[in-house]
């Protein structure tokens, strides 16, 4: 019985050591990928398209608002055959931003009252 217990402890220790090494390898690869993604994001952030401007050249270039990124929305104007694309914010996200702003203001008032 003691042998089985010692063998089990040995296997658990060996497994945890090998999985820790694999996780370290994955973490290093993830860090490298993350750094390259951050560099790309910083480069892309400088060229964002403001809200209500044409985004047909790059549909993923809309600027971020306080909480959410704008969405490139395409439509056909009335009586026109050409497609027009502009950066816009969906209404539900607009309302969520307004609610978050009001909650933040209310939280500040509560902090003043009790803080």
Curated annotation (Swiss-Prot):
<dbReference type="InterPro" id="IPR011142">
    <property type="entry name" value="Spider_toxin_CSTX_Knottin_CS"/>
</dbReference>
<dbReference type="GO" id="GO:0090729">
    <property type="term" value="F:toxin activity"/>
</dbReference>
<comment type="similarity">
    <text>Belongs to the neurotoxin 19 (CSTX) family. 01 subfamily.</text>
</comment>
<dbReference type="GO" id="GO:0005576">
    <property type="term" value="C:extracellular region"/>
</dbReference>
<keyword id="KW-0800">Toxin</keyword>
<protein>
    <recommendedName>
        <fullName>U3-lycotoxin-Ls1j</fullName>
    </recommendedName>
</protein>
<feature type="disulfide bond">
    <location>
        <begin position="55"/>
        <end position="72"/>
    </location>
</feature>
<feature type="disulfide bond">
    <location>
        <begin position="62"/>
        <end position="87"/>
    </location>
</feature>
<keyword id="KW-0964">Secreted</keyword>
<feature type="signal peptide">
    <location>
        <begin position="1"/>
        <end position="20"/>
    </location>
</feature>
<keyword id="KW-0732">Signal</keyword>
<dbReference type="Pfam" id="PF10530">
    <property type="entry name" value="Toxin_35"/>
</dbReference>
<feature type="propeptide">
    <location>
        <begin position="21"/>
        <end position="44"/>
    </location>
</feature>
<feature type="disulfide bond">
    <location>
        <begin position="74"/>
        <end position="85"/>
    </location>
</feature>
<feature type="disulfide bond">
    <location>
        <begin position="48"/>
        <end position="63"/>
    </location>
</feature>
<keyword id="KW-0960">Knottin</keyword>
<dbReference type="InterPro" id="IPR019553">
    <property type="entry name" value="Spider_toxin_CSTX_knottin"/>
</dbReference>
<keyword id="KW-1015">Disulfide bond</keyword>
